[in-house]
Amino acid sequence: MDTSNAAGNSSNDQIEVFFDGLCQPYNPGGIACYAFIIKKQQEDPQTIHSEYGLAAEPFTDYATNNVAEYTGIIKALEWLLLQQTSELNNNHTATESIIIKGDSQLVIYQIKGRYKVKAIKIIPLYQKVMSLISKFNDIHFEWIPREKNSEADKLTNYAYTKIIDSDPTLRKKIGQHMATEQQLEFLKNLGISPEKYLSKIEAKRLISKIKKYRHNI
């Protein structure tokens, strides 16, 4: 097991995993969703599997962004372990180097041992991750900026939208937390198409980021 960065590893057998998690319309205690995408690293990288879902019971203390991030890693590792077991059972050698990439610096650095895990609800998830990665021979973790994790980010937002679409009770409960007409109009005037269930908090973050960017140019 190796949880260091895999920088410089150009092996054609490398597997890349991009994971993400969110908790909206507020964190903690909102609707926590996870997603992950697994790619085979080659000249033209191919997605070999992707998955998304609910990370915790909505509107509970357990529903947090970090729970969702950890759930994404756990689900990805469980899928990879299943594939590895299948290969070994078919007398194939599981030789791929695996690199797990995410934009949560906290989660990545906890797994790499740079940060301590202090939150009670995260400890069992962290222990589960460490147990799973011990089953792989060549596995690495790398923090990436949010803009380089756009596919996984879009998939978590898709999961969030799909879950709310399927449950009228959830739609009713989040109503007061949705972005205001003024916020939506501001974003649309900039050519930005807001997510279907964009929260006030997320809209405020986006607008602040845009204003800061425009001020600096």
Identify the role of each PLM range:
Residues 33, 97, 184:
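Exposed beta-strand and adjacent loop surfaces of beta-rich binding modules
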Residues 1-11, 87-91, 162-165:
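Glycine- and charge-rich intrinsically disordered segments
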Residues 2-67, 71, 78-79:
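RNase H-like nuclease fold core
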Residues 162, 166-217:
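Interfaces that engage single-stranded nucleic acids at replication/repair/recombination sites
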Residues 55-62, 138-142, 190-192:
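General secondary-structure propensity
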Residues 22-26, 74-161:
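RNase H catalytic domain
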Residues 63, 67, 120, 143, ...:
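A short glycine-/small-residue-rich loop at the edge of a beta-strand within enzyme catalytic domains
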